[in-house]
């Protein structure tokens, strides 16, 4: 195992900066996930750690050693790519041992490591098969096993589940989580799927246009996003946003006016520092935190546009006339409502988020479980 540290790391191609002043501390044995939309720089960051991309400025340390100029093979890292990249003419055992053979490892060492890793990955009964005889999930396990037998200090995974169908992704997600718990290796995992990030990570790094938007534990990012980008990216369905105007402030409270015909006002338990009366801000509320209207004091009303029945839950898209945008309301179980009907939902102030015009969040003061 080894720690990974990035100090003011920047990557640029000519005038185009793809990673800017990245500062990260990844501790020994942590499972860290880089997550963000396409083009945010997450794979480039992983490739700089692996040595497949040069660092324009800043420093990379693996353990205590500065690695900027160290060749990839000498960094003690192993990488699994989105593509399995298996040799079709070689067996599972031969694919897994290929790197060790090139490195000149002894046959006894190779056999021992391959057999140990095959047991961990439940591949022992498949060692003599060729890749064409394997399922997608089995091929990905072979690709992971090929990296594991090299015993890297840091394990890098670049969107390894993207080529799998939905059921296999869930299965492999569980297997990767179990693998990390069993081996205790430092793992850095890249994905655009925030569900993978939330379920796998000890720590999530959210990237936006080459910058680190926020670093934290999954529930911390979910309940206390640092800005509007993180709030909208983490969580599915995404957070609802309403334009509001500040009408008053107090210690640890901000009063805002909702965009409704009755100009209803509500006090939000958020940090009021630097919040000015009259400021235009955004109120955020997650679909699952909205309430049935009969148990709430603050009511929003609109017309049902779309009803998505998922069996275990219902997602209702409601158009609020005064803001000409849809809110998504999510409730467990089946909710029977017709499209075109008028529907009212409740807004719990303690579950609301408030964002300044520059997108930064006013710190929520409501204590959430698990954080």
UniProtKB/Swiss-Prot annotation:
Catalytic activity: D-maltose(out) + ATP + H2O = D-maltose(in) + ADP + phosphate + H(+)
Cellular compartments annotated: Cell inner membrane
SUPFAM superfamilies in the record: MOP-like, P-loop containing nucleoside triphosphate hydrolases
Enzyme class of the recorded protein, top EC level: translocase
KW Nucleotide-binding (keyword) present: yes
Bilayer disposition of the protein: Peripheral membrane protein
Positions contributing to ATP binding: 36-43
One Pfam family it belongs to: ABC_tran
Keyword Iron among record annotations: no
Highest taxon listed in the record's lineage: Bacteria
Subunit structure: The complex is composed of two ATP-binding proteins (MalK), two transmembrane proteins (MalG and MalK) and a solute-binding protein (MalE).
Protein name: Maltose/maltodextrin import ATP-binding protein MalK
The species this protein was found in: Escherichia coli O6:H1 (strain CFT073 / ATCC 700928 / UPEC)
């Amino acid at each position: 195992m080894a720690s990974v540290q990035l100090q003011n790391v920047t990557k640029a191609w000519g005038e185009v900066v793809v990673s800017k002043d990245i500062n990260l501390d990844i501790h020994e044995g942590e499972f860290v996930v880089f997550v963000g939309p396409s083009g945010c720089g997450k794979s480039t960051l992983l490739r700089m750690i692996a040595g497949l991309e040069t660092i324009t400025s800043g420093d990379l340390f693996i353990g205590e050693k500065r690695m900027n100029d160290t060749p990839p093979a000498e960094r003690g890292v192993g990488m699994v790519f989105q593509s399995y990249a298996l040799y079709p003419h070689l067996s599972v055992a031969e694919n897994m041992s290929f790197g060790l053979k090139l490195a000149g490892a002894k046959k006894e060492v190779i056999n021992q490591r391959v057999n140990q890793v095959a047991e961990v990955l439940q591949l022992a009964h498949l060692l003599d098969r060729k890749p064409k005889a394997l399922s997608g999930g089995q091929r990905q396990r072979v690709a992971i096993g090929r990296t594991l037998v090299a015993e890297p200090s840091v394990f890098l995974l670049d969107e390894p589940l993207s080529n799998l169908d939905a059921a296999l992704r869930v299965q492999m997600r569980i297997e990767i989580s179990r693998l990390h718990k069993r081996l205790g290796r430092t793992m850095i995992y890249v994905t655009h799927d925030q569900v993978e990030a939330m379920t796998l990570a000890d720590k999530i790094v959210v990237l936006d246009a080459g910058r680190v938007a926020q670093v934290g534990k999954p529930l911390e990012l979910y309940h206390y996003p640092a800005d509007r980008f993180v709030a909208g990216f983490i969580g599915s369905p995404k957070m609802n946003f309403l334009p509001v105007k500040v009408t008053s402030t107090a210690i640890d409270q901000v009063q805002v006016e909702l965009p409704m015909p009755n100009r209803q006002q509500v006090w939000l338990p958020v940090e009021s520092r630097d919040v000015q009366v009259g400021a235009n801000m955004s109120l955020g509320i997650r679909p699952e935190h909205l309430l049935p209207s009969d148990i709430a004091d603050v009511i929003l009303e609109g017309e049902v546009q779309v009803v998505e029945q998922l069996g275990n839950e219902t997602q209702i898209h409601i158009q609020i006339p005064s803001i000409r945008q849809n809110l998504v309301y999510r409730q467990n179980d089946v909710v029977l409502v017709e499209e075109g009907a008028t529907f009212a939902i409740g807004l719990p102030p303690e579950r609301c988020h408030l964002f300044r015009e520059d997108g930064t969040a006013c710190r929520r003061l409501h204590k959430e479980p698990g954080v």
